[in-house]
Amino acid sequence: MENRLKAKYENEIRPALIEKFNYSSVMQAPKIDKIVLNMGVGDATTNSKNLDEAVEELGLISGQKPLITKAKKSIAGFRLREGMSIGAKVTLRGERMYDFLDKLVNVALPRVRDFHGVSNKAFDGRGNYTLGIHEQLIFPEIDYDKVNRVRGLDVVIVTTAQTDEESRELLAQLGMPFAK
């Protein structure tokens, strides 16, 4: 079964982008390359059980096994040693990427309290978009009763767009609710 968002991109969004930005080839049209989810678990230095819970939750949200990230260098102020496990990340591509984006835009973001749209300023100048989510509870896979700690996560949407304007147009047409 083909993904709804992927089909919409191929049949409606890509032709609209080609027309709007006057591309000479279909391959010039920007597309989503990957989505990276990152959960920093700073309190994993004192209690490693927190990291296990974060990894489990990230796995439920993304649908694939997270990679545990390690500290690159020691920082005495944070009681951190080089090589300590301090977070988890997942890189989504292909079908899972479109599934996650669909779920994020249509299910998770509307569940955020006092939500007025995502920021227009979170582009990095090269067509990538970064979104911070304050609580993992907005995702339908997370059971509210089993969560003992509210954690946030970063969502980075990497596109092949050359400029922020192209990337913004792509994400807006995919349904990303930008603030007016």
Curated annotation (Swiss-Prot):
Swiss-Prot/TrEMBL keywords: Ribonucleoprotein, Ribosomal protein, RNA-binding, rRNA-binding, tRNA-binding
An individual GO BP term: translation
An MF annotation (GO) of this entry: structural constituent of ribosome
Record bears the keyword Nucleotidyltransferase: no
UniProt-listed Gene3D superfamilies: 3.30.1440.10
A Pfam family this chain is assigned to: Ribosomal_L5
GO CC terms: ribonucleoprotein complex; ribosome
PROSITE patterns for this protein: RIBOSOMAL_L5
Oligomeric form and interacting partners: Part of the 50S ribosomal subunit; part of the 5S rRNA/L5/L18/L25 subcomplex. Contacts the 5S rRNA and the P site tRNA. Forms a bridge to the 30S subunit in the 70S ribosome.
Entry similarity comment: Belongs to the universal ribosomal protein uL5 family.
Job of this protein: This is one of the proteins that bind and probably mediate the attachment of the 5S RNA into the large ribosomal subunit, where it forms part of the central protuberance. In the 70S ribosome it contacts protein S13 of the 30S subunit (bridge B1b), connecting the 2 subunits; this bridge is implicated in subunit movement. Contacts the P site tRNA; the 5S rRNA and some of its associated proteins might help stabilize positioning of ribosome-bound tRNAs.
Record-given protein name: Large ribosomal subunit protein uL5
Organism: Limosilactobacillus reuteri (strain DSM 20016) (Lactobacillus reuteri)
Lineage of source species: Bacteria, Bacillati, Bacillota, Bacilli, Lactobacillales
